[in-house]
Swiss-Prot record:
Belongs to the LolA family. It comes from Shewanella sp. (strain W3-18-1). Monomer. This is Outer-membrane lipoprotein carrier protein. Residues 1-22 form the signal peptide. Its main location: periplasm. Participates in the translocation of lipoproteins from the inner membrane to the outer membrane. Only forms a complex with a lipoprotein if the residue after the N-terminal Cys is not an aspartate (The Asp acts as a targeting signal to indicate that the lipoprotein should stay in the inner membrane). The keyword Transport applies. It is found in: Periplasm. GO terms for cellular component: outer membrane-bounded periplasmic space.
């Protein structure tokens, strides 16, 4: 599920200094200012370690500050992920199941968190290396399940991102029809619980 959240690419020279990494991270943060809200179509291609295509798909992605996320895979099998800034909902229509998680616990495990987070604490968990129009984001935690996320821009517009996991699978997402979130689109970030579904609530409970 981490990979889906990334929904959902490396090779950084060892001679790069910490200052260079910091500058690259700041450049990415500056670029993301222009992506404060985004709605886009995506096409997904997943290849294994042998570069064999093992999955394709398409759908809609939306992002908005602060901490709002919408992912709707429409083909080949429907699934949906919605984050309202507090909770994250994962809906599998085929299984008729909804999983609810704490937003911070779920999204912070993924470098995609940087697309919806602006706080220094979150950014300090990743190293960023700029390569032409792309930025490679690597988690500092060795057990994250993700090796690298690469996000690419053209004229400051997010055009694609790739996710490489620790099993060698590469998920490539090509974006099109990018738009700024409208007032009507804000409803995307409010999950409406379907009827007659099983609910797996994994949110952390406050202990009395």
């Amino acid at each position: 599920m981490k990979n889906l959240l990334c929904a959902v690419m490396l090779t950084s020279p060892l001679l790069y200094s910490t200052a260079v990494f910091a500058d690259d991270a700041q450049q990415l943060r500056n670029t993301l200012v222009n992506t404060a809200s985004l709605k886009t179509d995506f096409k997904q291609t997943v290849t294994d370690v042998n570069k064999k295509v093992i999955q394709t798909g398409s759908g809609i992605l939306a992002l908005a500050h602060p901490n709002q996320f919408y992912w709707h895979l429409t083909s080949p099998d429907e699934s949906q992920i919605v984050a309202d800034g507090k909770d994250l909902w994962i809906y599998n229509p085929f299984a008729e199941e909804v999983v609810i998680m704490d937003f911070a616990e779920a999204i912070n495990a993924s470098p995609i968190a940087l697309l919806v987070h602006r706080d220094d604490t979150t950014w300090s968990q990743y190293s960023v290396t700029k390569k032409q129009d792309c930025y490679d984001i690597r988690p500092k935690a060795i057990d994250s399940g993700i090796v690298t996320v690469s996000v690419c821009f053209k004229n400051s517009q997010l055009t694609k991102f790739n996710v490489l996991d620790d099993k060698g699978n590469l998920s490539q997402f090509d974006l099109s029809n990018q738009k700024v979130i409208t007032t009507e689109d804000k409803a995307l970030f409010k999950f409406v619980l379907p009827e007659n579904v099983d609910i797996d609530d994994q949110r952390l409970k406050t202990l009395n």
